[in-house]
Amino acid sequence: MFEGPLQDLIDELSRLPGVGPKSAQRIAFHLLNVDPDDITRLQDALGAVRDGVRFCRICCNISRDEVCRICNDSGRDRGLICVVEEPKDIQVIERTGEFRGRYHVLGGALDPLANVGPRELTISTLLQRIGGVLDDRELADSTPDTPLLDDKPQIHEVILATDPNTEGEATASYLARLLQDFPDLVVSRLASGMPLGGDLEFVDELTLSRALSGRLPL
């Protein structure tokens, strides 16, 4: 254990995903030895993210504006929604060049052990986009502070692109059951080729491209 600000820095770094105590210590000592201007740039970047990044009011993706670049793109199919867990998953799918619809970011996956239920995700916002009822008993108290949409295009298909692990599969199954209430809506899941137990973030572009092209109805 170190004393004072150094230990405080190590403790804060250890709270970051994927950063253990040893890695946090290495980062802290690295920061002690870098040029002060580098520290200032890091502080500025963190402040800019805190103050300048928000969530798109339509799809809940990260954005600098009220509506993100993808939702503002008139060349995309507004009736096709790909549901992902996190904003980083959008970047992976975009790199394939296969998908020309819009997205919806859940903000995670259902995980009872971590106390993540429907109320902690943007499921009610997704239903709102499709035209669902917002006073569903399971979701009535779950809505993040997302304004009502100004427009409601006719949604014809929802692709469930949650991670192919236990939590992602449970989330996809839950959403598929909810979306059965919309008889004209096609609900599909990414096709085979996705590794079970993995994260979408680490799937290569070719595998993901084939999965998108060969998606199957649920």
Swiss-Prot record:
- Highest taxon, organism lineage: Bacteria
Q: Where are the zinc fingers (C4-type)?
A: 56-71
Which InterPro entries does the entry link to?
A: DNA_Rcmb_RecR, Hlx-hairpin-Hlx_DNA-bd_motif, Rcmb_RecR, Rcmb_RecR_Znf, TOPRIM_dom, TOPRIM_RecR
* The Toprim domain, residue ranges: 79-195
Matching entries from PROSITE patterns are given as:
RECR (PS01300), TOPRIM (PS50880)
Report keywords, A-Z. Answer: DNA damage, DNA recombination, DNA repair, Metal-binding, Zinc, Zinc-finger
Q: Does the keyword Protease apply?
A: no
GO aspect biological process, one term: DNA repair
Gene Ontology molecular-function annotations: DNA binding; zinc ion binding
UniProt record similarity statement: Belongs to the RecR family.
- Purpose of the protein: May play a role in DNA repair. It seems to be involved in an RecBC-independent recombinational process of DNA repair. It may act with RecF and RecO.
For this protein, the record's HAMAP family field holds: RecR
Q: What is this protein called?
A: Recombination protein RecR
Tell me which species this is from.
Corynebacterium efficiens (strain DSM 44549 / YS-314 / AJ 12310 / JCM 11189 / NBRC 100395)
Q: Which gene encodes it?
A: recR
